[in-house]
Amino acid sequence: MTYPQQRLLTVDILNFKCYQHHKSFGPFDHVTTFIGMNGCGKSIMIEAIAFVFGEDLPDPKNPHNEHLFYDYNIRCVVSLKFEMPDGSTKRFTRIGLKTTYTYMIFNKYVTEEEYLLELGKMNFRFAGQNISVYNKTTLKVTRKSAEELGAFFDIVSNSIEFKPEYDELKAKLNFAESTVLRWAKMIDSIELEKEKFITLTLYKLYLCDKEIQETKEKFVAEQLKVNAKNAKMPLRISRYSEAIPKQTPSPNFKNNAIVVRPKTHNHYDNLITVDKLNSYLNEKVTERRELLQFAVNHPNMNIRFSEEGPNIYAREIDYTELPEYYKKESDDIIATSYKRSMLEKEIKKIRQCWLDENNIKDDANIDNINMRIKEATTKHTLALNIESEARLNWEKLRVMRSARFNNFMAPLQTSLSRIYAEIAQDEDSLAFLRPLDEEEPYLAIDAFVKERHSEHISTRTFHGGSRMIVDLALIFAIHEWKPSPLVVIDDIDRNLYHEASKKIEPYLSRQKQTQFIVTTKEDSYFTEVTKTITLEN
């Protein structure tokens, strides 16, 4: 019989889990089957082999290694003895202590790096899962989600070597993208603020114009009242006025109006006459209408309100000596003028309320907003450059990682289709893998099967023996990609019916360059072409 280049001869176990004292298994044949019911130690023996190949077998309830020891022992020892192509033997031993491990090759202590390096020279790669297969993990490889299957193949293909740098560059890219998005939103926010500012300014001008128009109508009504009162005054008021000495007018007499205003004992200085108020209101209405049109045409210009009117030169007339009848008429005129003064103050108050309610400061203008937009645009452009550089670096690494992953997937696809058809003994049967993302295939992989006269079906919908055959076909395809001298399969008959086991057995016997160790509960499975070892409870 042809044997692999390296062949496992014996397994020696001391105080490992359920095995007390020293326990030896072997020698092993090309295909060796362990038969026994649940609880006889089949799976523990498989775990012992995996322990030698470097698996930690962690227990989430016990952070130390006590879960590896039998009862109250303080250490466990597992040793594998191999026969080399030249006929010599090599022994690998791993010793588990309470918080650490020690390693031996032959009878010499070595470091963990030297130990794993020597195993690697014999093509034992536990990270690739091509040595040991467990009934709770790897044997159910196709039952994983698409993301879990992608992560599993990422480990097997060793494209996971790029993952730390990939994740770092991806984080930088995501941060750069979020920065670009943040500044873009900031620009949009300032642009919206600009539109609101312009709209609010125009609306303020509209309200101001409307309020002035209403106030003007009130003033006109007041003027009519004053004119009516003045019409009743006798002509001798005019004669009395002529008897009072005239004051010298301003040097700019021709350019200024002379207004006669009363001088009473209360000394109301600087009273606004009806003519001046009318003129002032008309100027304000005209000014605001022009400002409204100018703001529409030039929304980025500052808005300024002028409160100054034309200079008025007046002469004072003393009405204190007039009779009471005339004094009453004069007091009515003064009271009306006072009302106008209060109305003007009300206009100023309304204008200030508009400014306060809309939170518009006097120095707020379009130029300030445009400056903020310019600053935000500059930072947005800088963020775009950083994002472009981060994307370029990430893209280079993504291409390298995808290339290594695809170099693994291409031969795996071919092997999977062939092995599945061989095990199923149906040339029309087809099993294949499909990445969910072609640019980043390592993120998610889904497995499909196409039987005769059927559509493509996801393997996650399979049950029983059909699913087990797909699992084994995929495991054998992974092993064929980079074969190791030994493959261990625990509970190979799980969910297999007798006819399916008869399909698996011939395939194992044809793999002359690989040694197989399998466990089963059924003594009628895998017995025709293999060496059997029965384990008792």
UniProtKB/Swiss-Prot annotation:
Pfam families, alphabetized: SMC_N (PF02463)
Tissue: Expressed in the germline.
One of the record's GO molecular function terms: ATP binding
Keywords for the protein's UniProt record, in alphabetical order: ATP-binding, Cell cycle, Cell division, Mitosis, Nucleotide-binding, Nucleus
GO biological process: cell division; sister chromatid cohesion
Subcellular location: Nucleus
Binding site for ATP: 36-43
InterPro entries from the UniProt entry: P-loop_NTPase, RecF/RecN/SMC_N
GO cellular component: cohesin complex; nucleus
Keyword Repeat: no
Functional summary from the UniProt entry: Acts as a modulator of condensin function, possibly by binding to the condensin SMC subunits and thereby inhibiting their function. Negatively regulates the condensin I complex in mitotic chromosome segregation. Negatively regulates the condensin I-like dosage compensation complex, which functions in the regulation of X chromosome-linked gene transcription, by limiting the association of the complex with the X chromosomes.
Subunit text: Interacts with dpy-27, mix-1, dpy-28, dpy-26, capg-1 and smc-4.
Family the entry assigns: Belongs to the SMC family.
Protein name: Structural maintenance of chromosomes-like protein 1
